[in-house]
Amino acid sequence: MPHPSWNDRYASGELPWDTGQPEPLLVEFVTTGGITPARTLEVGAGTGTNAIWLAERGFDVLGVDVSPLAVEQARAKIEGRDLRCRFATLDFLAAPVPDGPFHFVFDRGCFHVFDEPEERARFAVQVAGALVPGGLWLSLIGSTEGAPREVGPPRRSAREIALAIEPALEILELRSAEFRSHDAKAWFCLARQRTIPAQPSTRHD
């Protein structure tokens, strides 16, 4: 399970990740044609900023979050608006994802909150199960690169990311980026639902 008191965080307003603006790396990915409007799942949608931004651009979006209060706040933002956007409370590791499959899954800093390798691998399996064949997952992940810091996103290495994701999905791109709202290094990880299983490593004889 992730941090046990997400609902308390939303109740207190202690939300350094919630800037009220769409994630710049997502905006760049969409506006440069990385993905066109499609059925989309956002995991860890929080108060809905990114999901709503996508819906405003023609995406059909389901945003899920483990915090009922976050979901309540997200729903309030779209009340009375003519958007293909909805929100649901979901423990992503433990429950089936409703309304799938999807062509695109997005998470900003949700995958990286899980400390155990088995949890991160389970997260990737859940994403793969929610995608159509060839569907894309964009995950923005705190990085072990950069200067030491005492606050900010959890840090994960490229190796930890690959070990969790590669059995379930094909990594298309893993590059250094930045969480601009935190001035912290990040990984931009784009993966694709496999159409054939990954093959085992081979020896050079």
Residue ranges and their predicted role:
Residues 109-113:
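Short catalytic micro-motifs in class I SAM-dependent methyltransferases
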Residues 1-41, 47-99, 114-130, 135-205:
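Class I (Rossmann-like) S-adenosyl-L-methionine-dependent methyltransferase catalytic domain
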